[in-house]
Amino acid sequence: MANYSHAGDHNILQNVSPLATFLKLTSLGFIIGVGVVGNLLISILLVKDKSLHRAPYYFLLDLCASDILRSAICFPFVFTSVKNGSAWTYGTLTCKVIAFLGVLSCFHTAFMLFCVSVTRYLAIAHHRFYTKRLTFWTCLAVICMVWTLSVAMAFPPVLDVGTYSFIREEDQCTFQHRSFRANDSLGFMLLLALILLATQLVYLKLIFFVHDRRKMKPVQFVPAVSQNWTFHGPGASGQAAANWLAGFGRGPTPPTLLGIRQNSNAAGRRRLLVLDEFKTEKRISRMFYIITFFFLSLWGPYLVACYWRVFARGPVIPGGYLTAAVWMSFAQAGVNPFICIFSNRELRRCFSTTLLYCRKSRLPREPYCVI
């Protein structure tokens, strides 16, 4: 691999602009710092604050761990290759290991975002089932399943099934995309695109579900039933109680008055709690959809370039487009902390109180007198 890096395209190395190298190193260093520090702060917050020990934040913690792995291990090797003039100075085995970790992180994020979209739909459409079944152990089982599937997708190229190699134009070790007639990586790309499409379809179904529940339906009045001025039935109102208290009713208490005073307040409180939980679940779903949207937007240009290499025969991919697409895929590892803080009010509040130790209202001091 080292011989391949130095021998083949020595003229290309001389044409690399120092300004382009400086911009690559600066931007990649910033991505590494933000990806490691930002995701580490979010992870510490999720572990330290017990109010965040819930199903969606377990999945968010797993996403942060995957981004930390990619930022701390894979990106420094890219930084070194750019610094050495787009050359790989390590061995073939190291290249395969780094490529394996990068592809593992990519597929893990895609699989996890799909599982999160399914749980978000269950949280809103089937909330009772969601609260009973999605416990800590269920989330742990989902996380282990996602990592297992990701390893199954990323490990075959290590055995030269869809070969990993150093791609000079991308400054990284990854899939070597050849023409579709002699290609081994097309199946991996098709599966990744299918996962992203399925995730968008689940969120689309969730949007339709919420929209249908928000439609204003006409009120249908059902007449109340009365035999002795004690109205009861589906259309009964509070007038039955007034009639009965005024003495118009004879006989036993009507059915609509049994237990109303004892249960009305509890029912009202329970309904308000459900509405509050529904709003919280909607905010969390919005945050995860923004994360999914940014993942698709930042990885989309690179996927287009990969499909271009496989199917296009004529023109070569422009170098500027390929560099921008690769660096956008790198930037995906550092955007999640910003999305979490700016789109989730609960995380923002916990971040200020737990990590920054800022509180809006201080505890009152004990009274004292001056003698």
From Swiss-Prot:
Cystine pairs: 95-173
Cytoplasmic topological segments: 48-58, 118-138, 211-287, 343-371
Extracellular topological domain residue ranges: 1-26, 80-96, 160-189, 309-321
Source superkingdom: Eukaryota
An MF annotation (GO) of this entry: G protein-coupled receptor activity
Predominant localisation class: membrane
Entry keyword set: Cell membrane, Disulfide bond, G-protein coupled receptor, Glycoprotein, Membrane, Receptor, Transducer, Transmembrane, Transmembrane helix
Subcellular location(s) of the protein: Cell membrane
Residues annotated as glycosylated: 3, 84, 183
Transmembrane segments: 27-47, 59-79, 97-117, 139-159, 190-210, 288-308, 322-342
SUPFAM superfamilies per UniProt: Family A G protein-coupled receptor-like
Membrane topology classification: Multi-pass membrane protein
InterPro entries given in the database record: GPCR_Orphan/Phoenixin (IPR051509), GPCR_Rhodpsn (IPR000276), GPCR_Rhodpsn_7TM (IPR017452)
GO cellular component: plasma membrane
Pfam family, one: 7tm_1
Function according to Swiss-Prot or TrEMBL: Orphan receptor.
Family according to the record: Belongs to the G-protein coupled receptor 1 family.
Protein name per UniProt: Probable G protein-coupled receptor 85
Organism: Danio rerio (Zebrafish)
